[in-house]
Regions:
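Short acidic-hydrophobic, aromatic-tinged amphipathic segments that line or gate anion-handling sites
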Residues: 1-4, 70-75, 175-182
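Glycine/small-residue-rich loop that forms an oxyanion/phosphate-binding "nest" at active or ligand-binding sites
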Residues: 64-96
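Active-site/ligand-binding-proximal alpha/beta "capping" segment
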Residues: 197-246, 251
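Short beta->alpha connector loops at strand-helix junctions that form conserved
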Residues: 74-75, 126, 152-153, 175, ...
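Boundary-proximal intrinsically disordered activation/regulatory segments immediately upstream
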Residues: 1-59, 155-156
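RNA substrate-binding interface of SAM-dependent RNA methyltransferases
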Residues: 108-202
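Acidic/glycine-rich phosphate/pyrophosphate-binding loops and surrounding catalytic core
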Residues: 86, 90-91, 95-117, 155
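Structured adenosyl-cofactor binding patch, chiefly the S-adenosyl-L-methionine
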Residues: 143-144, 158, 163-171, 229-269
Length: 269
């Protein structure tokens, strides 16, 4: 059992939770809780830590999973130190990052798993800063059939603990890549036959007036400033989400969910 918060392994795990640089250098991230561990791809699980208290009350199935991964027992104090949450669940794991390619983003996890070929449905996110928004977009994206997500370098770190929690497990099933130049990527997608729609207050047509049954990508911008002009202008069309009252625009994550749900609705026929 690890009982010292000064232990080198503990310090390393703490760094993974607190520093994007540490996660990036070692190609890992942290998850908490048994539910997330169950959903993690086996080959991506690197290390597992658990408290005696959790083991004492765990089901036989959960114990089997923990021992299969060679879980290391730690004291409550150590778990509190390593965990990002205020009230840790008693299970924490170090997960290897998976390096997706653009091809995997276009193809999508769900299509690969089902063997069905559907038109790509993408989210292109520019400078999304709020971890909760980013995690929610992954989760709602999975639920609405998004095949993959393309992020600008200015977006929040997708591997931060807050983003990971917000995905509710979708982090393991939603292909994504970061790109240096979003507007250039939008243009590249156009050469691949993918129509790109920028969520924008200057849109002349409502989002539900377009056909999204063909290869489609939605562009969502920063929570406060929206899309940069360069990126918005690279899109095939501007789309507007009509609002009532004095509300000017939707939350970024809500906008993404509305647009991708409409695409999902159309594709259901």
């Amino acid at each position: 059992m690890i009982t010292s918060t000064s232990n080198d392994r503990v310090k390393r795990v703490v760094a993974y939770g607190q520093k994007a640089k540490a996660r990036r250098e070692d190609g890992v991230f942290i998850i908490e809780g048994m539910k997330m561990l169950r959903e993690a791809p086996v080959l991506q699980v690197s290390e597992v830590y658990v408290t005696e208290k959790f083991v004492d009350t765990a089901s036989e199935g959960d114990k089997e999973i923990l021992w299969r991964y060679g879980a290391e027992t730690v004291s409550e104090e150590v778990m509190n130190k390593m965990a990002d949450t205020q009230t840790p669940q008693g299970v924490l794991a170090v997960i290897r990052q998976y390096p997706y390619t653009l091809e995997e983003v276009l193809e999508g996890y769900n299509q690969s798993a089902s063997g069905k070929e559907n038109a790509p449905l993408l989210l292109i996110l520019e400078n999304i800063q709020d971890p909760g928004n980013l995690g929610t977009m992954l989760r709602s994206g999975e639920g609405t059939g998004v095949t993959g997500i393309i992020l600008s370098k200015g977006c929040a770190d997708i591997f931060s603990p807050k983003v990971i929690r917000s995905t509710m497990g979708s982090i393991f099933r939603m292909p994504f890549i970061y790109v240096e130049n979003v507007s250039e990527m939008v243009k590249e997608l156009g050469t691949k036959g993918i129509s790109t729609y920028a969520a924008h207050l200057k849109g002349k047509k409502s989002y539900d007036e377009f056909d999204y049954t063909k290869p489609t990508a939605f562009l969502i911008g920063n929570e406060g400033n929206g899309l940069t002009k360069e990126t918005a202008d690279a899109a095939s069309e501007y789309v507007l989400i009509p609002m009532k009252g004095e509300v000017e625009s939707m939350n970024a994550a809500t906008s993404a969910a509305i647009l991708t749900f409409e695409a999902s609705r159309q594709r259901r026929g």
